[in-house]
């Protein structure tokens, strides 16, 4: 009898959602690791190419304004065809990871060709969703760029609150699109409907998960430092290689956990919304 991990039988607490994410992660890690490994390597292709050509990984100009520097760096990346190719590969493989996790968590047999074919088929919808979601969030913080100096950062700090609300409301859009096959706009609307009224609940979940991932990367950094001391003997090239490989391994493991958490959150919100809708339908005749 297959072990059904999705959807949960009832609405869950924050701890139970994280536990569900870890159970999905453990059950699917080995079968998702090839996708995650290729995705992590693909994500590093622009940096590897620049290193091979002797180009600096970061822009050479001084950082006088952090926000402008980040924006200029992002615009520079978007002009790089290799960055677009790497981003498309990462997007497809990320979608394939969630689709495979959903298949395993629901107790159905998996097939690599099906996962990848579905991910590629839904790529246009995912890209449209990411663009629309990014614009919906960015429109709240763009006014900060009209100011300069400390006023820019003060306004940005104030605008982060509504931007965060929009980001959380749309956070389930990508999983919804992949699992249900809805279009980009329909997935965004469905995500907003699912997350409505659960802002603090989701904020706590994402915050705890972020702390766990930061702790994982910190531990990996310590391990890389120890290995560098033992193996490098002061050789900067060896230190860089050991650190890079360690971080890539951690990223390869962290990527499936990210998607397992997204799936666990989607399952909980779906059960919550279905329960609320059922309660509303049952109470409707009594109020008439």
Region roles according to the model:
Residues 2-8, 42-43, 54-78, 98-108, ...:
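Juxtamembrane transition segments at transmembrane-helix termini in multipass membrane proteins
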Residues 15-42, 112-139, 165-217:
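Interfacial aromatic "cap" segments that immediately flank transmembrane helices
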Residues 24-29, 33, 68-82, 99-106, ...:
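Hydrophobic alpha-helical transmembrane segments
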Residues 50-76, 117-156, 234:
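Long, highly hydrophobic alpha-helical transmembrane signal-anchor segments
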Residues 75-91, 153-167, 247, 251:
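Alpha-helical transmembrane segments
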Residues 86-98, 125-126, 133, 258:
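Solvent-exposed, amphipathic alpha-helical "stalk/arm" or coiled-coil-like segments used as scaffolds
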Residues 93-121:
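Hydrophobic transmembrane alpha-helix segments characteristic of membrane transport
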Residues 131-134, 138-160, 207, 211, ...:
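Hydrophobic alpha-helical transmembrane segments of integral membrane proteins
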């Amino acid at each position: 009898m297959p072990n059904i991990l999705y959807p949960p039988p009832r609405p869950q607490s924050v701890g139970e959602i994280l536990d569900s994410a870890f159970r999905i992660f453990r059950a699917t890690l080995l079968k998702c690791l090839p996708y995650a490994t290729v995705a992590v390597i693909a994500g590093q292709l622009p940096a590897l190419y620049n290193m091979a050509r002797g180009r600096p990984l970061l822009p050479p100009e001084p950082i006088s304004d952090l926000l402008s520097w980040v924006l200029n760096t992002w615009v520079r990346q978007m002009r790089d065809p290799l960055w677009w190719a790497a981003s498309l590969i990462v997007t497809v493989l990320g979608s394939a990871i969630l689709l495979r996790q959903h298949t395993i968590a629901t107790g159905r047999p998996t097939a690599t060709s099906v996962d990848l074919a579905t991910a590629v088929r839904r790529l246009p919808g995912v890209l449209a969703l990411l663009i629309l979601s990014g614009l919906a969030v960015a429109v709240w913080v763009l006014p900060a760029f009209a100011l300069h100096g400390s006023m820019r950062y003060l306004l940005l700090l104030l605008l982060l609150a509504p931007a965060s609300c929009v980001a959380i409301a749309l956070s389930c859009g990508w999983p919804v699109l992949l699992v249900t096959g809805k279009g980009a706009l329909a997935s965004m609307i469905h995500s907003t409907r699912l997350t409505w009224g659960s802002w603090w609940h989701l904020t706590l979940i994402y915050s705890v998960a972020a702390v766990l991932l930061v702790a994982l990367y910190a531990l990996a950094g310590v391990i890389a430092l120890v290995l560098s001391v033992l193996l490098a003997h002061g050789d900067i090239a060896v230190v860089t290689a050991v650190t890079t490989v360690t971080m890539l391994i951690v990223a390869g493991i962290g990527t499936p956990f990210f998607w397992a958490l997204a799936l666990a959150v989607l399952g909980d919100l779906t059960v919550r919304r279905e329960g609320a809708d059922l309660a509303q339908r049952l109470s409707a005749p009594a109020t008439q």
